[in-house]
Amino acid sequence: MTNIRKTHPLLKPINHALIDLPTPSNISTWWNLGSLLGTCLIMQILTGLFLAMHYSSDTTTAFSSIAHICRDVNYGWTIRHLHANGASMFFMCLYLHIGRNLYYGSYSYLETWNTGVMLLLTVMATAFMGYVLPWGQMSFWGATVITNLLSAIPYIGTDLVEWIWGGFSIEKATLTRFFTLHFIAPFIILALVLTHLLFLHETGSNNPLGISSNSDKIPFHPYHTIKDILGLLIMILTTLALTLLHPDLLGDPNNYTPANPLNTPPHIKPEWYFLFAYTILRSTPSKLGGVLTLICSILVLVIIPMTHTAKQRSLTFRPISQCLFWILTADLLILTWIGGQPMDPPFTTIGLLASILYFTTILILTPTAGLIENNLMKW
């Protein structure tokens, strides 16, 4: 008798995607991050749904509604901090996932890679809008600074900013539309995730060697599901430890002060996961130049497949490119650190040098290293 999961119209696609999926036998723990990101997304949707039941998207009551959630709602403080720290875990997994794809050359699956970049941009936009909702000092001023960047666009910039604000400054209309968009965005992300998986399952997964694995594949369940559960437990324990022991570790103390348009914080900064892009933005002297470099810092991922010059796909046997990959990783950590510092020497100089190194490594040094390695291999 045929198993129902292989014949039922609803269960058959799930079976092909999660149970009987032919998977390379040699993929490492770095391939766990996709399932971790899926778990993070589900957790964010569920906690966000419960928060939305009690949140008020009005400038006069938004801050107090967050206080009400934490004080009066059963386990409201847990849900709120799970949502905030869950976002941090989401970005941690997201950046590790991108790093793994860069290291092992998975960007050569163009459709999967490009939908992944679209996902990254959508998740970043969603997180930014979510950061505005508590209506604390950093929420208000962060939103003011970032949305104001659009005014650098020639001709239409000022009109565009006022259209996004729904007025001449950030006010009730802005908060309402940010809440609406923040609520709907995870479902758009969910649709993009399905597209991402659809393209991935068209080609099959890459592997650490970067070679075809058609001759050696195993079913996803039980082998890789067991491996994924270990990563899942580690992530859940880390998130719970962060939420229950140090809930405000990754937040900003200024957000415990209600938004005040008349009092500017001494140092405006976004959440830690945007700091690298924020450093690149403020290291550029002109406003329009800063906006362009900010956009390019993310969209540079789209052109990485075009800059691949090596004959080998993965970095596993390419020592020069490996060194450059870890230099890029260290550079991103430096950019993140500088983003949290005030705009004073020597931080401005370090930020400028790190920003230049970021683009140079991706666009010039890595393609050059690929050509050198081809010559060393006599290819």
Curated annotation (Swiss-Prot):
What residue ranges are annotated as transmembrane? 33-53, 77-98, 113-133, 178-198, 226-246, 288-308, 320-340, 347-367
Q: Which GO terms describe its biological process?
A: mitochondrial electron transport, ubiquinol to cytochrome c
The entry's family comment says: Belongs to the cytochrome b family.
Q: Which cofactor does it need?
A: heme b
Q: Which positions in this protein are listed as binding heme b b562?
A: H83, H182
Q: What is its main location?
A: mitochondrion
Q: Cofactor binding mode, per the note? A: Binds 2 heme b groups non-covalently.
Instruction: State the InterPro entries in the record.
Output: Cyt_b/b6_C, Cyt_b/b6_C_sf, Cyt_b/b6_N, Cytb/b6-like_sf, Cytochrome_b, Cytochrome_b_C_euk/bac, Cytochrome_b_N_euk/bac, Di-haem_cyt_TM
**Which is an annotated Pfam family here?**
Cytochrome_B
Q: Does the keyword Transmembrane apply?
A: yes
* Listed name of the protein: Cytochrome b
Membrane topology per record: Multi-pass membrane protein
Gene giving rise to this polypeptide:
MT-CYB
A cellular component term (GO) from this record?
mitochondrial inner membrane
Residues that, per the record, bind a ubiquinone: H201
SUPFAM superfamilies, from UniProt?
a domain/subunit of cytochrome bc1 complex (Ubiquinol-cytochrome c reductase), Transmembrane di-heme cytochromes
